[in-house]
Amino acid sequence: GSEMCIRDRCSSVMGLGGFPASHKLFLGTLGMHGAYETGKTTANADLIIAVGARFSDRVAGDREKFGENATIIHMDIDKAEINKNVKSKFSLIGDLKDTLTTLTALCESKSNPEWLKEISDWKAQFDKTPEYNSKDFAHAYHIIESVQKLTTADDIIVTDVGQHQMWVSQKYKFEKPRTWCTSGGLGTMGYGMGAAIGAQTANPDK
């Protein structure tokens, strides 16, 4: 049902891995540290389905203007999150596995190649990765790309808090759930070492 009625997808920093980054409909993270194309897509969308999102200021920015041209459907297991930060026209409360299954069954298959082409053009135009020059210092993106080549989709990536955390969220391609450990909401400095030890203890074979 990924392509039935939803034409593109983006994620919060904490949601990375919930949808494969290699999928052609995945755009990246949204918000002040996100990709340009996700902001453009959200601003021009006619329908936004928010799944388990809380619309923090880092994601929504000016909450009064977020998705102002779109019908917003907000899905969450906690009804306290509904309309707390961004007003939605419709809401679905419950386990997301059930609510998403129900919603997908109601969707009609539609195609909008012009919209997908426009998004593709935004992505190509605003690629933030600088060209690598071995005579200069490596950019953080080049280091993250190297780490990507040395790891698998099942490996767990842990960061601390700061600029490197945002670089990883922007550039590392997470393919599976629970492979990304970071302190996004609280932003706790020093989180990384303890989280890495915990992840290794819980997953001794990784």
Where are these regions (language model features)?
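Active-site diphosphate/adenylate-binding microenvironment
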Residues: S120-D205
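General beta-strand structural signal in soluble alpha/beta enzymes
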Residues: C10-S12, A50-V51, G94, I157-V161, ...
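Short, small-residue-biased leader/transition segments that mark boundaries at the very start
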Residues: G1-I6
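Glycine-rich, acidic loop regions that bind phosphate or pyrophosphate groups
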Residues: G15-E118
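Beta-sheet entry/capping signal
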Residues: D8, D46-I48, T71-I72, D155-I157, ...
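Residue-level signal for threonine
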Residues: R7-S12, A35, H139
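Short helix-capping/linker segments at secondary-structure and domain boundaries
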Residues: C107-K110, A202-K206
